[in-house]
């Protein structure tokens, strides 16, 4: 029995002079919740399209459920459920009508299709009143739930989720996270692509960090943060962040890195400083910030996160976006 549901071996994909995916190899074990992380332009979308069979690799092989995707494309499609980032639903239909339409595309019909639709509507936790409304009246979170349900109609073993919580408010994001956890507990193998490191830390037991077409780190969130020797992050909320402030903090002895970070929940921009000895150099940091005429509104000490690991490995933030590949 094959223990890996996804096997990517030396995959490269070129678009004329651009190498979008560069000699990538990785495995996703059966029942794993695997995160593929990286900024726009990292090559995540191209790799996902190759996993779905939408485009072919320039070189290398991909297997899903033990089947080579180029030799057995129809078998792989039976095994895969794909949830794209964009909502793929018909606005003028209600939830049940949408699921009926997509179920027929999978070859389902009659009582089997009706029963499966009712199972999935129960899974989405939408009430009957909502189910009867047109999709055009749904919130973003409700649309995402039906989008996921549509990908589950044929009971796939492997589920690909492309940025499933993009654009959702915190409440709907947490609801989607719970759906993903439930699917994984049922034994589904899930590969989640995201640029949100907190999402990967919360959900995934294995992650690959991708940048400029390459896998630059692979392991559990704990393993990856342990690889970083710096133990602490100092998060400072200043009254303003200027280039002079950034230069001043980067010159402090003992500072490994300093960078801007945007807190999506609080809607504020903070200054993050990575160091091995936070308590020792905190007075120097306060002095440097004051010297450039900046006021400190708050200071917080925390552990290294996956986003901090990414910045240390690449030298840039996830929000320094490039064109998606």
Question: Which residues fall in each region the model found?
Answer:
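ABC transporter nucleotide-binding domain
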Residues: 179-276
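C-terminal coupling/interaction segments
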Residues: 276-325
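ABC-family P-loop ATPase nucleotide-binding domain
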Residues: 1-12, 316-325
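Conserved beta-strand immediately N-terminal to the Walker
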Residues: 5-7, 17-20, 281
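Hydrophobic/anchoring residues in structured secondary elements
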Residues: 13, 257-260, 301
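ABC transporter nucleotide-binding domains
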Residues: 13-211, 216-217
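Conserved protein kinase catalytic domain
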Residues: 77, 121, 225, 310-311
């Amino acid at each position: 029995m094959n223990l890996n549901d996804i096997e990517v071996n030396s995959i490269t994909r070129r678009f004329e002079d651009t190498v979008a995916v560069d000699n990538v190899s990785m495995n996703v074990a059966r029942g794993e919740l695997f995160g593929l992380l990286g900024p726009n332009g990292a090559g995540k979308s191209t790799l996902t399209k190759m996993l779905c069979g939408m485009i072919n690799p320039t070189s290398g092989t991909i297997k899903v459920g033990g089947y080579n995707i180029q030799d057995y494309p129809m078998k792989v499609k039976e095994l895969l459920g794909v949830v794209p980032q964009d909502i793929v639903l018909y606005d003028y239909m209600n939830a049940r009508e949408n699921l009926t339409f997509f179920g027929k595309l999978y070859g389902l019909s009659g009582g089997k299709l009706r029963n499966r639709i009712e199972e999935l509507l129960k899974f989405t936790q939408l009430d009957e009143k909502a189910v009867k409304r047109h999709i055009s009246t749904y919130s973003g979170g409700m649309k995402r739930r039906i989008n996921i349900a549509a990908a589950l109609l044929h009971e796939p073993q492997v589920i690909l989720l492309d940025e499933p919580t993009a654009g959702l408010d915190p409440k709907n994001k947490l609801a989607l996270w719970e759906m993903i956890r439930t699917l994984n507990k049922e034994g589904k193998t899930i590969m989640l692509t995201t640029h949100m490191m907190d999402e990967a830390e919360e959900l995934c037991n294995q992650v690959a960090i991708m940048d400029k077409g390459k896998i630059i780190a692979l392991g559990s969130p704990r393993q990856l943060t342990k690889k970083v020797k710096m133990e602490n992050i100092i998060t400072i909320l200043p009254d303003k962040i200027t280039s002079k402030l950034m230069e001043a903090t980067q010159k402090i002895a003992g500072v490994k890195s300093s960078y801007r970070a945007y807190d999506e929940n609080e809607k504020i921009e903070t200054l993050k400083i990575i160091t091995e000895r936070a308590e020792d150099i905190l007075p120097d940091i306060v002095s440097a910030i004051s010297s450039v005429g900046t006021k400190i509104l708050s200071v917080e000490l925390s552990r290294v996160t996956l986003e901090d690991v990414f910045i240390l490995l690449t030298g840039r933030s996830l929000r320094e976006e490039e064109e998606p590949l």
